[in-house]
Amino acid sequence: MGETNSRLSPFLTLISERPVFIILAMSAGADREGQFRRMRETAREIFQQALAEASIDRAFAQHVHCEHGVLRVREDLYDLQAYSNAFVISIGKAGHTMVQALTEQLGSSLEGIVATSVERSTQVRGFRYFRGGHPTPNAESIQAASAMLKALEAQTESSLVIFLLSGGGSSIVEKPIDDEISLDDLVATYSVLVHSGAPIAEINTIRKHLSSVKGGRLARRAFPAQQVSLLVSDVPDDTPDALASGPTMPDTTTVEDCYRIAEKYELPRQLPPSTRELFERHALEETPKSDDPVFHRSRWWLLLSNQTAVEQAQAAAEAAGFVVRVDNSCDDWDYERAAEYLLTRLRDLKKEFGRVCLISGGEVTVKVTNGGMGGRNQQFALACATKISGESVTVLSAGTDGIDGNSPAAGALADGMTLERARVRGLEAGIALERFDAYPFFQALGDAIETGPTGNNLRDLRILMAY
């Protein structure tokens, strides 16, 4: 009997240890899944903190003050008693939020016009509101432009005009330069531009020269009033005149740039006849430049930009214990190229530092060929998901305005378990990527970033973490 037990003991030991092995394996899997979940939560927290710290209310409280009838905007002082009146024009996705912040500093006696793309349940007293279209103009976009042009024409040399500009203004306020261009043709033209694959700066170059309000033409209508523009920017810091297509700033682009861009992306053959004719006849008119007298009484101040959001995300990631690096070099790159570049950079940084966070600002481009539901941030995140399966990597890409493409989301999260979790639910990342249909994919996983419209617009943030 003792001999039998001796012979069986290895098998008994093996049998008794096997459940331990299974339990340990399951425990390791659960720990790894828990780590991915915690990192997704951390990425969300970093993004949310960046939004909170780069808010419009904070920027106005820091840079705009009024005391004893004197308005201070950064380094400028304006004695309000020296002007016959002050009139405010607010344009863009942050139009309402900026007016609210301004009235908190100056009081409720202001009046003006607000054009934004978000429907408001409340409005600031004294202001006329328009809900313009985005990413393409609508009837109210044209009505807003007409109302602004008429109001600015009534301003005098003793008037102070305060312009509040934010992203999205290019379509939210619009009036074609040629009356022969109908709203339908204008919408068709915008659609061609948005889906051309061109970066926003090139799109805005053409928008300026097709518009009665862009490229400094709104400032021309306000002349000779004193003008000051406050900017919440969704364009690169070195091209401020691209914000809302620069309605109050000297235009650094030319009609020759327009013709070159149109040829580069083969635009004329895609445009409706009324706008195509302007390109074919080279009939576009030049916009006002920096030496134009209309800008002699104009000032411009940047209050917030993508760099602000990047810096706040960096601070939040450092507080979370990451070594942080910032790389904005892929701004305006194709999303696939940007994903490959940033992931390669992240892997290199991980070898050097271990727990590392790579933050990238700006925007990637997507040339849409199939009409699914999503946007550039979700498309970028999905592309990353297909490249990081099994890796201890988490990627968040989202827009600071809370809106990504034609979806309800601001962006999405992806990590080394995304494809595995998707397969369990019968989701195919490759099909969603090909169809530009990323939102249903991420929404089903619970990894869509849904903030709702934030009232701000500082371009996009990409947060990549390796651990």
State what each model feature region is.
Residues 89-91, 113-116, 162-167, 229-235, ...:
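Short beta-strand segments
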Residues 115-157, 206-207:
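Glycine-rich oxoanion-binding loops at beta->alpha junctions
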Residues 101-110, 126-129, 176-188, 220-224, ...:
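A glycine- and small-aliphatic-rich helix-loop capping segment at beta-alpha/alpha-beta transitions
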Residues 25-83, 97, 257, 271-288:
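N-terminal amphipathic/basic leader segments beginning at the initiator methionine
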Residues 222-228, 250-341, 345:
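Accessory alpha-helical/coil subdomains and C-terminal extensions
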Residues 137-140, 150-242, 247-250, 434-437, ...:
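Glycine-rich, mobile lid/loop segments that gate access to catalytic sites or pores
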Residues 382-467:
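Internal helix-turn-beta structural module
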